[in-house]
Swiss-Prot record:
<dbReference type="Pfam" id="PF00472">
    <property type="entry name" value="RF-1"/>
</dbReference>
<dbReference type="GO" id="GO:0005737">
    <property type="term" value="C:cytoplasm"/>
</dbReference>
<dbReference type="InterPro" id="IPR000352">
    <property type="entry name" value="Pep_chain_release_fac_I"/>
</dbReference>
<dbReference type="InterPro" id="IPR045853">
    <property type="entry name" value="Pep_chain_release_fac_I_sf"/>
</dbReference>
<dbReference type="Pfam" id="PF03462">
    <property type="entry name" value="PCRF"/>
</dbReference>
<keyword id="KW-0963">Cytoplasm</keyword>
<comment type="similarity">
    <text>Belongs to the prokaryotic/mitochondrial release factor family.</text>
</comment>
<dbReference type="InterPro" id="IPR005139">
    <property type="entry name" value="PCRF"/>
</dbReference>
<keyword id="KW-0488">Methylation</keyword>
<comment type="function">
    <text>Peptide chain release factor 2 directs the termination of translation in response to the peptide chain termination codons UGA and UAA.</text>
</comment>
<feature type="modified residue" description="N5-methylglutamine">
    <location>
        <position position="251"/>
    </location>
</feature>
<dbReference type="InterPro" id="IPR004374">
    <property type="entry name" value="PrfB"/>
</dbReference>
<dbReference type="GO" id="GO:0016149">
    <property type="term" value="F:translation release factor activity, codon specific"/>
</dbReference>
<protein>
    <recommendedName>
        <fullName>Peptide chain release factor 2</fullName>
    </recommendedName>
</protein>
<keyword id="KW-0648">Protein biosynthesis</keyword>
Length: 363
């Protein structure tokens, strides 16, 4: 990097910061936080538990947004000032340090942009994830299990919790399907764009001839809805099936039919849950999954971007990302059009850069 390149970078970041300020209006955010704090001082504030909870969530979000913006703006202003002084003094050491820290400065501005993008109605919610292998038997089932592990590792890296709702072992390897919840701040906001078909190209570990194989798996993301959000489901539109459950890996086979499968006829959505020994609890969890999926479907219709991954054959259509392990190593996202070479790290859950790249591309 040289002086001209760094100078242009600073101008670009300053423009972005100015645009961010126009969007979030920091002074108005401060005023809103002051109003919330006054509301919380009122002894009657906590009588409406749901309203108090929502207000507190908003307070946390606004505080985080303001702090992230202010920290980034201060760092940018300081860099601009230091750059000007270092140029005037021909201070090569300071200039070199500024060049080295340029990516950190860029990431800081990007972080504020991401905070703005995670302000949707349910972005702060937990995420319900369903993974289904495509055609191809063992190959696709193994790929589905690799994706499952990738998301679990991502959750671990962020300090999030996960809970299995349904798990079906593959015939030889991998999984026939899995549904689980990732619980953490903005889990749904970060993962909402993961819905779609994920494609894997690799030398098959199950092929004695070591041929290259292409596998597909479908991922669907929906927000875990709060209990106060009312989604009407007509009983005549659903069928309940009860069956014996087994845990991940085939452990804890139940002697009673505690697992629950719900089929919603109007949409064709099927959900199932077997994580608990109680049929009643599994039914409640399955209903929550169904409501979340129906809500997500309605949201997509309203936005005129309805996706049909679940209704279409999982194959070449509706792909959002390709993971190539052979003959070269690369992960490429179709929305951001960005390619990544750290494939091993990505499959181990290091997907923040991909998720953020898609959020920015879709902004």
């Amino acid at each position: 990097m040289d002086n001209y390149t760094y100078s242009e970078l600073l101008k670009s970041l300053q423009n972005k910061c100015d645009n961010i300020a126009l969007i979030i209006k920091p002074e108005k955010v401060k005023q809103k936080l002051e109003r919330i704090e006054k509301e919380q001082e009122d002894p009657n504030f906590w009588q409406d538990v749901l309203k108090a909870r929502d207000t507190n969530k908003e307070k946390v979000r606004l505080n985080r947004l303001l702090e992230t913006y202010q920290k980034t703006k201060n760092a940018l202003d300081e860099s601009v000032e230091l750059f000007e002084i270092a140029q005037n003094d021909n201070d090569e050491v300071t200039l070199s340090l500024l060049y080295e820290e340029a990516p950190i400065l860029e990431h800081g501005v990007q972080k504020v942009e991401i905070e703005i993008m995670l302000s949707g109605e349910h972005d702060a919610s937990n995420a319900i994830i369903t993974i289904q292998p495509g055609a191809g038997g063992t190959e696709s089932q193994d790929w589905a299990s690799i994706l499952y592990r990738m998301y679990l590792r991502w959750a671990e890296r962020r300090g999030f919790k996960s809970e299995i709702l349904d798990y079906q072992d593959g015939e030889e390897a991998g999984i026939k399907g899995v549904a689980f919840i990732i619980k953490g701040e903005n889990a749904y906001g970060y993962l909402k764009n993961e819905s779609g078909v994920h494609r894997l190209v690799r030398i098959s570990p199950f092929d004695a001839n070591a041929k290259r194989h292409t596998s597909f798996a479908s991922v669907q993301i929906s927000p875990e809805l709060d209990d106060d959000i009312d989604i009407e489901i007509d009983e005549k539109d659903v069928r309940y099936d009860y069956y014996r459950a087994s845990g991940a890996g085939g452990q804890h086979v139940n002697k009673t039919e505690s697992a629950v499968r719900i089929t919603h006829f109007p949409t064709g959505i099927v959900v199932q849950c077997q994580n608990d020994r109680s049929q009643h609890k599994n039914k409640a969890s399955a209903l929550k999954m169904l409501k979340s999926k129906l809500y997500e479907l309605e949201l997509e219709k309203q936005q005129s971007t309805a996706k049909n991954e679940e209704k279409s054959e999982i194959g070449w259509g509706h792909q959002i990302r390709s993971y190539v392990l052979a003959p070269y190593q690369q992960v490429k996202d179709a929305r951001s059009n960005i390619a990544y070479s750290n494939v091993e790290a990505i499959l181990d859950g290091d997907i923040d850069a991909i998720l953020e790249g898609v959020l920015i591309a879709k902004a």
